[in-house]
């Protein structure tokens, strides 16, 4: 199995705002994709995201939601390489910033798709950072 791990520091951002950016429709559409259906943050809820030129949606079931500190998703729909992977977000306060750690685990191997996803998450985290630090909505995938 192959796993990826990222960390980003968000200056002047509190953990509640970082959590909201990861768990609400308004938050996710502010930095990730403009097409997201986010019914809620209860365990069992399914987030559905669409991306340009993708023939399917990415469906993430909420497996854990600890306000302002941790979110876990299980990918139950999407490209074959994503299904069955887990996306885990840890959020903590560090002085005047929030620190967000992203772990995406359970990939079958380190192949080209894995490498592409690794770079993609780095780009998404920079979009998240810009959204939270400036308040300007600019989803990476906007259509």
Residue ranges and their predicted role:
Residues 1-38:
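Hydrophobic ligand-binding cavity/cleft-lining segments
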Residues 78-123, 128-130, 139-140:
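Beta-strand/loop substructures that line and gate deep hydrophobic ligand-binding cavities in soluble
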Residues 30, 36-77:
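Glycine-rich portal/gate segments that line the openings of hydrophobic small-molecule binding cavities
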Residues 18-19, 28, 47-49, 62, ...:
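Hydrophobic pocket/interface hotspot
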Residues 7-9, 58-64, 85-93:
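Hydrophobic/aromatic beta-strand elements that line small-molecule binding cavities or substrate pockets
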Residues 3-7, 46, 57, 70, ...:
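Intrinsic-disorder/low-complexity, polar/charged segments enriched in Ser/Thr/Lys/Arg/Asp/Glu/Gln
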Residues 27-38, 118, 123, 134-143:
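Structured surface interface patches that mediate subunit assembly and partner/cofactor docking
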Residues 13-16, 63-69, 90-99:
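A short, structured loop/turn motif at beta-sheet edges
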